Amino acid sequence: ALGLKAAGILPDDASQKVDPLFLELSAISRQSDFSGAVERAAPSVVNIFTRKSAAAHSSDAIGVNWDGDPETHMKALGSGVIVSEHGDILTNYHVVDGISNLSVALADGRTFEAKLRGKDVETDLALLQVKAEGLTAAVLGDASKLKVGQTVLAIGNPFDVGQTVTAGIISALGRHGFGLNSYEDFIQTDAAINQGNSGGALINLQGELIGINSAIFSPDRTEAFVGIGFAIPSSIINNVLPALLAGRNIERGYLG
């Protein structure tokens, strides 16, 4: 506030005397504030878990149900993204593969039982459905506008600690040949993606969904994040989601 008059009014030519470094730092600060994008996208990101019943043991004082009834335990599986206000949730197929008892926890704390509505194994995408009202659906972004170096945010539930946001950049586009899916066109990012983030959202700074976080590269197979994560781009989502919503099989052409 140096140089201000007592009344707090700047002289007319004050803008010409502002330190350029101050203006540069202010611009950087604005670019680093991702709260607007997070506020738009975070309500659409959910936690996917399974409920498992286990009989209580009277000899174990930890978690015993003293009524002797089976106790319900929850195991986090991954994350998902609400894609319609009617309760449709997109996630990775590998997150829910073989799980019959699925539940979803919304960002507002509500939980619902979920059912598998459709799947596309070849792109590792699956569609769940919950019966819930007041849902916020993600807005799908345009993958054709993505560029290497753009800032992106990953939202999910790593290690079941609760909804978490990490920031990074698009490190590469069109990554393939990993043998993870039959159809690969991954966005590579250095935004931290850890166990539990699978099925969660990769968003741009407008809060639009540009990818579904799917896998990480871990050279020592410890599942520790080393700065190389992969997301299924919105272009593939655009191709697969309409069929899943309509309950149709995904039809693809083959050469031969």
State what each model feature region is.
Residues 2-256:
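Serine-dependent protease modules
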